[in-house]
Amino acid sequence: MNKILTTICILTAAICFAACEGEDSLQPSHADSNPFNIDDAATDEESILKRDFYSRNGCYLLFNDTLNGGELLDIGYVMTASQNNNLYIYEYLKTIEEKSLAADFVEQYLLPHLGKRLRPFAFLLVKNINHFIYEDGLLKTPYDGTENPSFVVGVRATAISMSAITEMDDSEKKDYSKVLIIDIMTNIISHQTTDTFNQFTSYGKNYYGIWMDGWIETEEEGMPLQNAKGFIAPHQGEWGTIWSAYPTVEEDVKAYINLAMNSSLEEVELKYTDYPDIISKYKLMKKLINELGYIE
């Protein structure tokens, strides 16, 4: 923990120093360069692994969060947010054997199901991920139990902790990869502007993130109210499920991706006979993930 906090202090000081230097000149350095690129002339094993991975898959492979030119990868960066309150500190993979096994997991269990439009720009493969949040000017452990997440899906990259994977058998890896794939697709689909996606969100656009009248405590009472508005899962707050609140767009998308990946149309029609909007949204999500290149 002391090592992590020391790293945080160093990073904070470096950011402040860089900000002060940036005020002297508005001319960006390396403005046209790609900080993810691998040097074509590099012949070390890691560079060859990363270069071959990109050649085969069209997405970059990272083993630390320092990019070319010294830029730090901000995995929590969100284009629509005014600020990012999340900080991620990584414990890196050390040997080329560990890195090769990590790359093999991505190629064997994730990428076969993700067409080019669904693939992250880069994968950051590390041993462990430590998550902190900024609150009231202080760095704190998250309240929701995500201090050591297994993975983090960001705009520029998806970070995966390999320590959770090394002890898994083939069946467990397949189940775990499904969870990862759902989160990767949720991140991409939630930012779509296609007609299919707009049709999907039109069912719930007046209710996303809205509280119901009155307090609902149980699934038995809350789920029919959610289903009546075309939702199949409620909002998740810091302390757990909130049946009195409708889901956000991202939560709705994630729930329907899960449904589309794991249920047939016949199963959905049987379960949600009384809720035609849910059946329609299922069909739209099935169409959407196929349009974007999900491979079963």
Task: Kindly give the residue locations of the regions a language model identified.
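A cross-kingdom marker for long, charged
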Residues: 236-296
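C-terminal motif of bacterial Sec signal peptides marking the signal peptidase cleavage site
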Residues: 15-19
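Acidic/His/Gly-enriched intrinsically disordered linker/tail segments
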Residues: 202-245
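Repetitive helical segments and hydrophobic/amphipathic motifs
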Residues: 11-12
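Conserved aromatic-histidine-acidic binding/catalytic patches
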Residues: 90-98, 168-173, 220, 234, ...
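Acidic/His-rich structured neighborhood in mature extracellular/periplasmic domains
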Residues: 90-215
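Bacterial N-terminal signal peptides that target proteins for export
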Residues: 1-8
